[in-house]
Amino acid sequence: MNFQGKVVLITGAGSGIGKKAAVMFAERGAKVAINDISEEKGKETVELIKSMGGEAAFIFGDVAKDAEQIVKKTVETFGRLDILVNNAGIVPYGNIEETSEEDFDKTMAVNVKGPFLLSKYAVEQMKKQGGGVIVNVSSEAGLIGIPRRCVYSVSKAALLGLTRSLAVDYVDYGIRVNAVCPGTTQSEGLMARVKASPNPEELLKKMTSRIPMKRLGKEEEIAFAILFAACDEAGFMTGSIINIDGGSTAV
């Protein structure tokens, strides 16, 4: 996969899957706009890419509030926008009784409104250029029920609806839209939660027990799927949902 000359905007790229994807895009020639709500983490990703000889810039912004400015700044910095990766998201825990209206509003703002508006402004730019790609990072929770992930599941299912709708609406403009659905992934955030638990070994065992492969996913495995969904070699793929979950949604 070659992304030479492509400009990629990745939200939530200060850590985790977003950071890994940013590095992998840069390794393959892309210019990467790193968006994150944490200036410190976002700039760390930028410096990492630059240390490898790649090209990147930090674009500060809250996806729920600053979508138009995030896209505008990316285009001002690099002159165009070829690929948007809607990766930023939050993971609240709780069933419907444990979920407040405030929790619902915040989750939907970050996980749905943000990608919706970013896609809206990205599409406007991509139409001018003659095409582009949007990749939405959803979740296995958007496909199956997972205990105490109520509003998270709602938000990630909504992202799949957005993916299919955009794919149909903009196919004639050369814009492809796909989604990836990661399973439980060995990210910085998850492992911090495991280590902070009363019994880390038991929690990890519980997490992997429901996965047919009996292990957690790796950040690079999810990032690779994002790159594939965005690459020119996947030019006939749009409106597709890619599961990377060790078989969890197959049982």
Curated annotation (Swiss-Prot):
Instruction: Give one GO term, molecular function aspect.
Output: oxidoreductase activity
**Alphabetized Pfam families for the sequence:** adh_short_C2 (PF13561)
Q: What is this protein called?
A: Uncharacterized oxidoreductase TM_0325
Query: Which residues are recorded as binding NADP(+)?
Result: 10-34
Indicate whether Endoplasmic reticulum appears among the record's keywords.
no
Which EC class is the enzyme in? Answer: oxidoreductase
Species for this entry: Thermotoga maritima (strain ATCC 43589 / DSM 3109 / JCM 10099 / NBRC 100826 / MSB8)
Checking InterPro entries in the record gives:
NAD(P)-bd_dom_sf (IPR036291), Sc_DH/Rdtase_CS (IPR020904), SDR_fam (IPR002347), SDR_superfamily_enzyme (IPR051122)
Q: Which residues bind substrate?
A: 139
Q: Which residues form the active site?
A: 152
**Enzyme Commission code(s) on record:** 1.-.-.-
- Keyword terms of this UniProt record: Oxidoreductase
The family assignment reads: Belongs to the short-chain dehydrogenases/reductases (SDR) family.
